[in-house]
Amino acid sequence: MSKTFNVNGICYPNEHYMVNIDSKLAQIKQLVDEKKYFVINRARQYGKTTTLNMLVKYLADKYTVFFISFEGLGETAFESETAFCGTICELLYDTVLYEEVPTIDDTVKQIIIDSIKKKAQDMLSLSSLISNICKNAEVPVILMIDEVDQASDHKVFIDFLGMLRSKFLKRSTRPTFQSVILAGVYDIKNLKHRIREDHEHQMNSPWNIAADFSVDMSFTRDDIASMLDEYEKDYKCTMEDCGIDL
C-alpha cells in the first residue's frame, strides 16, 4: 500500500509520510532513564499521541511500557473511586489482550489478567497492584496515559495522582513505575486548580514531583524537508514539479 500524508489522528510509519522524530524520542528516553515523571502538554495536532505510540517501541528494548488513554471514557469511569480503579485495571488488561506491550514477561501478564477477575476497589488496592506488577517485572515499568484532559473535572483523578506521588516518594523501598508520562492539552496543575479551590491545595499539587518537559515538539524546515524527500523518491518528482516552494 502506498504511503499517504495524514493530518487526522495517529500516524504510522508504514502507512504515512512522517517527519523523523528520533531525536525527540531520544530526549524523552533520557527523562525516562533518569526516572522522571512528567507531562507532555501541547495543543492538538502537535503529534503527542503519535510520539507516545512510537515511544512504546523505542523504549521496548529496555522497559515494559503500558500505554493507555482516557479518550472515550464516559462519566461512569470517574463517578467513584471503585469505578475509576476498575477502569484502570481494564485499560491495563486491554494492552495485554491486544498485545500492545512489546516487552512483558509471563508473570506480569498473569498478574494483570488476574486483576480483571478481581478488580481493585480503591486506591490502596490499585497501589498494591502497581507494586506487584513492578516487583515482578524483569525490567523497569513505564506508564503512559494519553488524553488526561478527559479526567480534568474529576477529583478521583487527582486522588490517583496523589497515590502515584506517594509511591514516587517511597520508591527507594517500594516497587513502582520507573517513569510516568501524562499527555494532554493542558498543564496538569491547571487541571487541579479547576477542582480544588482551597489555596493550600492549589499550591500543593499532587503532581509537583513532575520534571519540566522542555523537548521541542515542533518541526523545523529541515525536519519537514526530510519527509518530503521520501515522497519525492516514491513518486520520482520534486516539490518544484508539484508547484511547492520550500
What is each of the regions a protein language model found here?
Residues K24-I28, L126-I130, L164, L228, ...:
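Generic hydrophobic alpha-helical segments
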Residues Q30, E34-Y46, T50-I158, Q178, ...:
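P-loop NTPase nucleotide-binding core
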Residues T4-I10, T103-K109, W207:
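Short, basic/glycine-rich phosphate-binding loops at helix/coil junctions
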